[in-house]
Amino acid sequence: MLTSRHWSPTSSRPHAEGIEGNALRYGLFYGADIDNVAAMLRRRMLPVVRNGGEIPFIHHEDAAAATLAALHHGRAGRAYNIVDDTPATFRQLVTGIAEHRHAPRPLVVPQRVLAVAAPYGKALFGGVSMRVSNARAKNELSWKPKYPSISDGIQAQ
């Protein structure tokens, strides 16, 4: 357990003699939960915005494989982006799940509706693009996503 003695007054990073680590920055997880998403679509409970930004996703199996790779090959003090190869919008993810599970396509709502109903959702899915590279993880961890896109990951479920 990290306690106050592990924190330097001049740094925001923990430190302890003989302990090294790295940081894994995961994309948004998806995978085995797609049946829950399809159920929400059937009840018309999962709207999307028309022009959302691209965000990084990661299939849960790929996240687990990357975590193991980091334990074996990760370099101390390094940060790794654990994301697939193809950024996508939340709308693309939800629409792909709808098609794969034969559920209704999501309702498309204006961003201002999402801002009122779900401010955090609007901030995350409503236009902000967060494109990141997984090149360091691939090179240094000897890892690559089994599902390089949300389309590949959805089809595997």
Q: PLM features: residue spans?
A:
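Glycine/proline-rich active-site loop of Rossmann-fold NAD(P)-dependent oxidoreductases
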Residues: 5, 16-19, 28-39, 61, ...
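Catalytic helix-loop patch of NAD(P)-dependent Rossmann-fold dehydrogenases
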Residues: 1-23
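Residues that recognize and position ribonucleotide moieties
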Residues: 22, 56, 86, 107, ...
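Mid/C-terminal beta-alpha module of Rossmann-like enzyme folds, strongest
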Residues: 64-67, 73-121
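A conserved pocket-lining segment of Rossmann-fold NAD(P)-dependent short-chain dehydrogenase/reductase
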Residues: 36-62
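Conserved C-terminal active-site "lid" loop/helix of NAD(P)H-dependent oxidoreductases
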Residues: 91-95, 115-144
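Amphipathic terminal alpha-helices
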Residues: 148-157
